[in-house]
Amino acid sequence: MPYIPMPYVVEQTHRGERSYDIYSRLLKDRIIFLGTPVDDDVANVIIAQLLFLESEDPDKDINLYINSPGGSVTSGLAIYDTMQYVKPQVSTICLGQAASMGAFLLAGGAAGKRFAVPNARIMIHQLSGGFQGQATDIEIQAKEALRLKAKLNEIMARHTRQPIERIERDTERDYFMSAGEAKEYGLIDDVFLHKKAAEKKPQ
């Protein structure tokens, strides 16, 4: 994978110039960007950002932009639980794609504040993974996978207001949606072309 240098932003202050990496500068405006697969390291950074922004201002919304193919279920659940835990409402915005755990986090945003741009792609499916080891270990892992699957379906049904039976059926295979279809499904609240359209939504 080619190395992509980190962009930096230089601002003028009364003390002179100050340089920020692009993610730190976005954080100043209460913007968090998830633009990678979800793993433990990514989850820890996003959780830290959520907690920091809560400590900065517990009453002001946080904007989580998502362009992610998904990833680890446990890492995604850690981010999701923190989104529900912090006092500020977390608005979610899909750019590009929100697949698997990316779609789960998109749906987990504050009610009325979940958005996607017109050409975004959203995909839900059941968790996947292979099991190795002795027969007893495989049985334990399979039971845990079924427990997690049921938990994810339950949460998704609650956020989309879809019957859990439909969530179970739709996630048996990769289920792709356009932004408009995701709105009809209840996974997002609106599709917008310009940022100002989202800002007009009631806070």
Curated annotation (Swiss-Prot):
Q: Name one Pfam family in it.
A: CLP_protease
The GO annotation for biological process reads: protein quality control for misfolded or incompletely synthesized proteins
Against InterPro entries, the record matches this protein to: ClpP, ClpP/crotonase-like_dom_sf, ClpP/TepA, ClpP_Ser_AS
Q: Where is the active site?
A: 100, 125
Could you name the Gene Ontology cellular component terms for this entry? cytoplasm; endopeptidase Clp complex
Q: Which domain of life is it from?
A: Bacteria
Catalytic reactions on record: Hydrolysis of proteins to small peptides in the presence of ATP and magnesium. alpha-casein is the usual test substrate. In the absence of ATP, only oligopeptides shorter than five residues are hydrolyzed (such as succinyl-Leu-Tyr-|-NHMec, and Leu-Tyr-Leu-|-Tyr-Trp, in which cleavage of the -Tyr-|-Leu- and -Tyr-|-Trp bonds also occurs)
Stretches of the chain forming a coiled coil according to its record? none
Localization, UniProt: Cytoplasm
Provide the alphabetized UniProt keywords: Cytoplasm, Hydrolase, Protease, Serine protease
**GO function terms (MF aspect):** ATP-dependent peptidase activity; ATPase binding; serine-type endopeptidase activity
**Does the UniProt entry include the keyword Cytoplasm?**
yes
Major place of localization? cytoplasm
Keyword Cytoplasm set for record? yes
The EC number(s) given in the record are 3.4.21.92
Question: What is this enzyme's class at the first EC digit?
Answer: hydrolase
Instruction: Note the subunit structure.
Output: Fourteen ClpP subunits assemble into 2 heptameric rings which stack back to back to give a disk-like structure with a central cavity, resembling the structure of eukaryotic proteasomes.
Q: Which family does it belong to?
A: Belongs to the peptidase S14 family.
What does the UniProt function comment say about this protein?
Cleaves peptides in various proteins in a process that requires ATP hydrolysis. Has a chymotrypsin-like activity. Plays a major role in the degradation of misfolded proteins.
Q: Which PANTHER family match?
A: ATP-DEPENDENT CLP PROTEASE PROTEOLYTIC SUBUNIT
The protein's name in its UniProt record: ATP-dependent Clp protease proteolytic subunit
User: Organism classification, top ranks?
Assistant: Bacteria, Pseudomonadati, Myxococcota, Myxococcia, Myxococcales
Q: Tell me the name of the encoding gene.
A: clpP
